[in-house]
């Protein structure tokens, strides 16, 4: 599997993504950043239930809430724009990981998102080691890619 398969995604900006001025509503950038890393782990081959807890079962005893997020808009993103979304995950420490997301239109960086997650035990809410599947995804994303952050 080539990193491009799970680290570069596409998204077309839809009418419902935009405000009355015809540009994306600010909250959508962070939503897209999160959806992109979810899609990335799916393409990589990690089942969602291995990362995201299921309220009906305690199969996954770890949760990964967002503890920090940022969005930077560098150029207007409008209805109909086709964006390339480049994902750069990295491990911060044993219980924190960060996903940097770059949104490009015609190879020009138009926005950036950053989301930091903390790995916690679902019951105690104490910090725990990142799930092995996430560790492998982060490692594979960083070792096998020839991409450079924008």
From Swiss-Prot:
SUPFAM superfamilies, sorted: Thioesterase/thiol ester dehydrase-isomerase
InterPro entries assigned: DHNA_CoA_hydrolase, HotDog_dom_sf
GO term, biological process aspect, one: phylloquinone biosynthetic process
Catalytic activity, reaction form: 1,4-dihydroxy-2-naphthoyl-CoA + H2O = 1,4-dihydroxy-2-naphthoate + CoA + H(+)
MF-aspect GO terms: 1,4-dihydroxy-2-naphthoyl-CoA thioesterase activity
EC number: 3.1.2.28
Keywords: Hydrolase
Listed CDD domains: 4HBT (cd00586)
Active site: 19
Record function comment: Catalyzes the hydrolysis of 1,4-dihydroxy-2-naphthoyl-CoA (DHNA-CoA) to 1,4-dihydroxy-2-naphthoate (DHNA), a reaction involved in phylloquinone (vitamin K1) biosynthesis.
UniProt name for this protein: 1,4-dihydroxy-2-naphthoyl-CoA hydrolase
Species: Prochlorococcus marinus subsp. pastoris (strain CCMP1986 / NIES-2087 / MED4)
Lineage start: Bacteria, Bacillati, Cyanobacteriota, Cyanophyceae, Synechococcales
